[in-house]
Amino acid sequence: MPQKRLQMLRGLIELVRPHNLVVAALTTLIGYGTVASIYGGDIVSSGYAYAALIVVLVAAGGYVINDYYDIETDMVAKPWRPIVSGRVSPGAARFYAYMLFTIGLIIALVTCPNFIVFGFAVLNALLVHEYSRWIKRTGLPGNIVIAFNSASTIVFGALYASCMIKGKVVLPSVALIPVLYAFLLVLGREFVKGIEDVKGDAIAGIGTLAVRFGVRTAYMASVAVLGLVVVLSPFPYISGVYNMAYLILALVVDVLIAYSLAILGRGVARGLEDAIRASRRARSALKLAFMVGALAFLAGLM
């Protein structure tokens, strides 16, 4: 294979962020597995494979289109990214993104011809596209969209499972527990990221909580949201759907959240520069907390 084509192929793979797609597939399994355990279906099945494939394709399209709309920013901040480095042309990237969106939505329509399931897939494709195009620059609404999209993989897995197992869309209320958990955890992480990026966001005119109201307010918002995650963490076990393995790992998540808030609180108390440095460590801890949380729900279903 000629060197140029090999570089383009590597660029196309890099654009879809494979490690993030693995996480998306796992969170889809949380929703699918929760509904399957309630209705007596197989957790790991061809139905789940289709659901994960749809989510992965739509998410991959979202990551590609994000790089497409971030060309100007990446020229300065990330010149090694596939498009700005010249490995993938902007036109090829845009075609690639729309192809991924289209294939994912076609699979959703063909494998589960249900208006709610297909409509939810379309909604998510539109949101990830519009987030990249303009919503990300709105600040708080952008934070909410990111949190929604992260949690929506669980919702889609649950909707798709009910379609495959029951033949109709039924969303048990207990399936919404991991959805709320993921939404709040990611939203809190977005508030922390807003502290980390406060200087650049202020220059770009992005109205995050940290920019509009200060890093202390953004910190207090993250405390409120992430504190709610800790408060809610026992309820999945209490519901009877998730076993003791969930509870043990959920406690690890709680510790990671407490750690991130503690180091961020100390940083905020010392001033802006310390807050920014502390937010990097806090965000890394929260990213780990999200992964452990996903594993908690998966282990809790076994």
Curated annotation (Swiss-Prot):
Belongs to the UbiA prenyltransferase family. DGGGP synthase subfamily. This is Digeranylgeranylglyceryl phosphate synthase. Pathway: Membrane lipid metabolism; glycerophospholipid metabolism. The keyword Transmembrane helix applies. The chain crosses the membrane at residues 21-41, 43-63, 103-123, 144-164, 167-187, 218-238, 244-264, 282-302. It catalyses: sn-3-O-(geranylgeranyl)glycerol 1-phosphate + (2E,6E,10E)-geranylgeranyl diphosphate = 2,3-bis-O-(geranylgeranyl)-sn-glycerol 1-phosphate + diphosphate. Prenyltransferase that catalyzes the transfer of the geranylgeranyl moiety of geranylgeranyl diphosphate (GGPP) to the C2 hydroxyl of (S)-3-O-geranylgeranylglyceryl phosphate (GGGP). This reaction is the second ether-bond-formation step in the biosynthesis of archaeal membrane lipids. GO terms for biological process: glycerophospholipid biosynthetic process. Keywords: Cell membrane, Lipid biosynthesis, Lipid metabolism, Magnesium, Membrane, Phospholipid biosynthesis, Phospholipid metabolism, Transferase, Transmembrane, Transmembrane helix. Its EC number is 2.5.1.42. The keyword Transferase applies. Pfam families: UbiA (PF01040). It is found in: Cell membrane. Its cofactor is Mg(2+). GO terms for cellular component: plasma membrane. GO terms for molecular function: geranylgeranylglycerol-phosphate geranylgeranyltransferase activity; magnesium ion binding.
